[in-house]
Amino acid sequence: MGLDIPGATGSCPDAAPLDESGAEDLLRGICFKTGPPRTVGVELEWLIHDRERPDLRVGQERLDSAVEAVRALPLSAALTFEPGGQLELSSQPAGSLMECVETTAADLAAVRATLGAAGLAPVGLGVDPWQAPRRRLREPRYEAMEAALDRTGPAGRAMMCTSASVQVCLDAGEEEPGPLGYGRRWQLAHLLGAVLVAAFANSPFQQGRRTGWRSTRQSLWADLDPGRTLAPGSGRPPREAWAAHVLDTTVLCIRCEEGPWNVPEGLTFREWIRTGSPRPPARADLDYHLTTLFPPVRPRGHLELRMIDAQSGPDGWLVPLAVATALFDDPEAAETVYRTVKPLAETSGAPAAPRNPLWTAAAREGLADPELRAAAIACFGAALPALERMGASGAVRDTVAAFTDRYVARGRCPADDLPEPGDLTARSLSADQSRLSGPNLLSGPSRLSDRTPPRPGKAASA
């Protein structure tokens, strides 16, 4: 199948070369799609390990067989796999938090059962505590990404092949200013984001050793190519700042129909437009360039919160999903949390996230940092009544409350409870976190694990 690149196979609807002003207009038009917040989504990444011996690498044939079985499931979510074999489920945009929780839990139950039949388990940790990075997917995108990220050190391969996250996707917000305005939500995301890093830090190990970070995953992102992983600079309106950031970030690769993709060094997208070499970029190239940018908050029409480590256990993922949704989408909670985190801007300073003192403290110290602990206590305290106002089930609220009591109130994070890698098992990770939740996620009699997953829909966009 031909790639969607201009000039590769004749005429193409979007093959007209971009000019600079046209690219800026496109970016300003697609990055923040405003309106009252109504939809929510979640993207869950999981490490795949043997249930009994997670320290042993899963053989390729065994993994391929399990992947084939999972692909055959009638999932609602979009199913993809990351370069190191991590499994990712991307939910459909849901009309409410509970709809997102229900459909995602049903998909996960089916995936977990299918992997379990092969003696495998999805493990929720921000970084694989056992395995060294080893890429399984041999695709031009990942060949080019590996080559480009290798220029700044080994963190790129570790991120690609051994990391996993919970990514919460929320509407951009309203055009007008106020608690639900997109400008306020954009600013909130970059301050509250550090609190979420600290509260959900769950990756203290790498290759069998303690790293000194509660979130080793976040430390990896901070070590990568800064243009590709930093937030846009402050001081500009969000649309203008994002458009400039995209155009001034280096191009990871220039796709071609045959042979390896070109991996230029130091060529920004703006310079590519101006020089037109090795070929003029078109709309499809700009769209693809956007998929190679990994800031902690990525505007894709909606806001994609990318800073949260994967969480252990069958229900761990729903806590960051519920908390983030409540704090952004409930007007009362959003106002409270904005006042709570606004003073963190002074600690953050001028550098962009995640390379500023606030985010560094969050990744290294978790909630042992007094300022982040105080902010987290206020934020989680605001989330609980907001969840009730939003119609979250009692079981979901109880799960969030249990996490708050176990970690936030005590200035701890999940990383603080993990045993050394030699004592970790896929079973212990699952059993440990399941104590945070009740037997099901709904207030009614039905159990999510007994529900039949819905038929596939369109690809997830939230």
In which residue ranges do the predicted regions lie?
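Terminal catalytic/cofactor-binding subdomain
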Residues: M1-G156, T162, A201, G301, ...
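Conserved phosphate-binding loops in nucleotide/dinucleotide-binding enzymes
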Residues: E99, D171-G173, P177-L180, I308-W317
